[in-house]
């Protein structure tokens, strides 16, 4: 991917900040934003803060949790200004290939919709898998932008450093909003980020192998209590179905109270997350091992009320 550093990319105080500034720069009250469900909550919240309407697109297991915009009605398309995509995905761990991004760019160009790709987990991948970027697609910069973050790539969560790249007009609009809200990034943080980017990248292979080991520990622990989850190719999460007879909230609460193990109920990420848990791979390996040991020792019966469909 080639970018004009003066026009087609800008630094952010973390990509989350950029999500909110993007919506302030590009949306008007009454505009529609197409948001996945389940999804990272700031996509929806930032749109609502800008006065926009949110139209959700369900991520379905039978479609490998890939967005399908074919069902969006003509009326919604006329008012739609943004579409959020996020692969490797939070919370599902799903990935998207180059053809998906080609279709997304074509969809955005056809309907005048800005395609907003959140690629925070683009460098957290396993078993030789290499995630694609939407900006690799020819013509993408005419209708797309991409967020990246040092938080996940370089283990720098809390340093608050990210980037927005792609469409030059959108980059300029975000810079204008930012110039009225913040005064830039601390020089020490930018120096650390530059050192991370310019330094030896081979350690990322070892780091990702560590995440893959934790992923396998989680999958084995879940299988021991009858939960079969799809092994993610990338991201920091395992997206696991809850046992029959449980809701996401009820099972997460049961795990916390009975075993002391904390999982995120899928409903935190939207109604489409019902029936699932998000399990993070960010804890130390020894803690993951202990959590799975406790999971294996858990014995109880499901509640009387069935899990909602």
Regions found by a protein language model. Name each.
Residues 1-309:
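PLP-dependent class I/II
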């Amino acid at each position: 991917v080639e970018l004009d550093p003066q026009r087609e990319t800008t630094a952010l105080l973390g990509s989350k900040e950029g999500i909110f500034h993007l919506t302030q720069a590009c949306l008007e009250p009454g505009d529609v934003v197409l948001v996945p469900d389940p999804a990272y909550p700031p996509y929806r919240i930032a749109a609502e803060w800008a006065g926009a309407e949110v139209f959700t697109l369900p991520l379905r297991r039978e479609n490998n949790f890939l967005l399908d915009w074919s069902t969006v009605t003509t009326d919604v398309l006329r008012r739609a200004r943004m579409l959020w995509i996020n692969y490797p995905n939070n919370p599902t761990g799903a990935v998207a290939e180059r053809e998906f991004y080609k279709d997304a760019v074509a969809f955005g160009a056809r309907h005048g919709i800005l395609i907003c790709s959140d690629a925070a987990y683009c460098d957290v991948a396993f078993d030789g898998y290499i995630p694609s970027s939407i900006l690799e697609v020819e013509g993408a910069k005419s209708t797309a932008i991409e967020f990246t973050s040092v938080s996940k790539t370089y283990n720098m969560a809390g340093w608050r450093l990210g980037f927005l790249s792609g469409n030059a007009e959108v980059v300029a609009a975000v810079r204008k909003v930012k110039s009225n809200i913040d005064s830039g990034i601390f020089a020490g943080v930018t120096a650390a980020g530059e050192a991370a980017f310019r330094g030896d990248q081979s350690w990322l292979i070892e780091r990702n192998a560590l995440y893959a080991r934790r992923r396998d520990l989680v999958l084995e622990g879940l299988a021991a209590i009858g939960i079969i989850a799809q092994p993610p190719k990338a991201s920091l999460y395992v997206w696991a179905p809850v046992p029959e007879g449980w809701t996401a909230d009820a099972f997460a609460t049961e795990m916390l109270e009975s075993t002391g193990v904390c999982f995120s109920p899928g409903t935190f990420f939207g109604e489409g997350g019902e029936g699932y848990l998000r399990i993070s791979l960010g804890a130390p390996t020894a803690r993951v091992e202990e959590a799975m040991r406790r999971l294996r020792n858990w014995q109880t019966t499901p509640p009387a009320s069935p899990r909602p469909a």
